[in-house]
Amino acid sequence: MNGAVLVTGGAGFIGSHVAEAYLAAEYEVTVLDDLSSGRRDNVPDGARFVHADVRSAEARELLATGKFTILNHHAAQVDVAYSVADPVADVGVNVVGLLNVLEGARAGHVTRIVLASSGAIYGQDAALPIDESAPKLPVSPYGVAKLASEYYVTMYGLLYGIETVALRYSNVYGPRQDARGEAGVVAAFSHALVTGQPLTVYGDGAQTRDMIYVADVAAANIAASRCSVVPLTHVDARAYNIATGAETTINHLATALSDVAGRAATPRHAPERQGDIRRSALAAQKARRDLGWRAKVSLIDGLPATFRWVREERGRVGRRTAPGATAARRR
């Protein structure tokens, strides 16, 4: 084994893929998740599961007394619109929860922390594609919390000598993504197409996103767990954009997924949402240089894979909720 890793949020969309990647790379994996948004069946076979809130004493004690050498932190509140509506709740999970596990990590055997961060820290006005040194001016409480998280992780690295790496994701998509919210736009469109509902586009649909497939993100986490770290001279020193560098409009995603589904769909436009970024593309040359990582899965391959998963998942849900299946479970 290469060491023991705790993946917080490992029953969620991204975290479960990260946990799978660690298992494939022969790490001993424990997943901690409160299942508030994650699913128990997302936890990969071979991983130990601990049902606990990232803010709990149990989570802190697990890290303090366990033999984990890596803390991979994916537990988060990820809905930008929700963060605008309730910034206190957002910071409770995304900052206080992080601090709780950082305290456990420094009391235990953790030698490296890999933090899931976000391109939301950059805000609206940076030149595209955005590199890691760009000004930080987040326009949502979610983005502010992610930036604060990077500073806290950097501080723990400086104070306690823990190696730290922050991964700033662009817009991640792929199997197991929640269909709710703009962050899951590919899953939301796929679900609508499978169920015969209209595609809801917030605003005019000309806003752009840098779409990165979840398997590429999982690979970046393994690279971040193994790389040599550079001196920690500032918050950007060990931060890496995990992205493709390409802009894709929401309208294009709607059209491309309609083509994959073989169904013409006219989007239904809704008002723009507070906190949404107009354009986004992140430069990933630094990750290529320091981590030896690059995105490999194109939209041409990633969109059909995601749509197939949503369609198959819809079929599984239908079978689980069919009258005969319900009666069988009751017997």
Feature locations, PLM:
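Short alpha-helical
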Residues: 13, 38, 78, 180, ...
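Conserved donor sugar-nucleotide recognition element shared by glycan-biosynthetic enzymes
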Residues: 141, 149, 182, 250, ...
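Hydrophobic alpha-helix immediately C-terminal to the catalytic Tyr-X-X-X-Lys motif of short-chain
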Residues: 148, 152, 156, 189, ...
